[in-house]
């Protein structure tokens, strides 16, 4: 690939780490946010994100020797963000010279990165356990049917983390029931639940959740990278997405 080739980039900016994946190159950055730049003084959320990504892009260009800009990017965002927040995320990337910006909700990306078939009618349940945010979602036909989230305020030991995860899953089940989506509840009992994010590696978490809910629970391969891997699966579709935008 030419050093001047225009890049397509998958981005996952979490509370503690930022991960960048370049199409045809794989993960090129997986670092603590604090290591990238001095971020004190950036109170505006958009400017903060732009500062983080500017430092991340500079680090990638330095390491790879590529002289080209990122042309198109797909960024994972929390489920349920407002239209204003979406514009902030998009604006941060546009300010860095990224021409085309696409957003994908983190639970959807996590499920895709974990290898779940999100487009089929049968439901998938994913719980993404990040450094500060836990998101549990039920997905069917490439859409999020239900999503519940909880901020991790302070350190949670394994017992309290397990209780929090179980509570979020049960809230999703109740939401599906209230919407009359009983078939999705049956799907979850059959297909089980997938755990992603660094917190998924908590010792005994998967088995405790499985026992409490009486369904299969698995931890994704490389759960910390599930979101960015899922975002990367969108990159080959960018040409068609751009066409659909008009």
Q: What spans do the regions from the language model cover?
A:
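Nucleotide/phosphate-binding catalytic cleft detector across ATP-hydrolyzing
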Residues: 1-15, 19-126, 139-193, 200-228, ...
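Gly/Ser-rich catalytic serine loop of serine hydrolases
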Residues: 130-132, 198
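A structural feature that tracks compact, well-ordered secondary-structure segments
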Residues: 135-137
């Amino acid at each position: 690939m030419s050093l001047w080739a225009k890049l397509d980039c998958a981005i996952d900016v979490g509370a503690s780490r930022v991960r960048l994946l370049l199409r045809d190159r794989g993960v090129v950055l997986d670092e603590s946010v604090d290591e990238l730049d001095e971020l004190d003084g950036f109170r505006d959320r958009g400017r903060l994100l732009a500062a983080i990504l500017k430092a991340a892009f500079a680090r990638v260009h330095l390491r790879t020797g590529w002289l080209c800009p990122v042309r198109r990017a797909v960024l994972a965002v929390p489920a349920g963000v407002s239209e204003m927040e979406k514009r902030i995320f998009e604006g941060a990337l546009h300010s860095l010279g990224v021409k085309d910006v696409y957003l994908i909700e983190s639970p959807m990306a996590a499920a895709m990165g974990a290898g779940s078939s999100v487009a089929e009618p049968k439901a998938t349940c994913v719980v993404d356990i990040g450094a500060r945010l836990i998101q549990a979602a039920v997905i069917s036909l490439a859409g999020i049917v239900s999503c519940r989230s909880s901020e991790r305020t302070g350190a949670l030991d394994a017992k309290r983390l397990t209780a929090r995860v179980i509570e979020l899953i049960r809230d999703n089940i109740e939401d599906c029931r209230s919407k009359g989506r009983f078939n999705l509840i049956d799907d979850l009992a059959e297909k089980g639940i997938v755990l992603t994010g660094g917190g998924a590696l908590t010792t005994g978490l998967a088995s405790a959740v499985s026992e409490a809910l009486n369904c299969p629970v698995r931890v994704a391969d490389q759960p910390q990278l599930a979101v960015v891997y899922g975002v990367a699966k969108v990159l080959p579709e960018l040409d068609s997405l751009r066409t659909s935008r008009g």
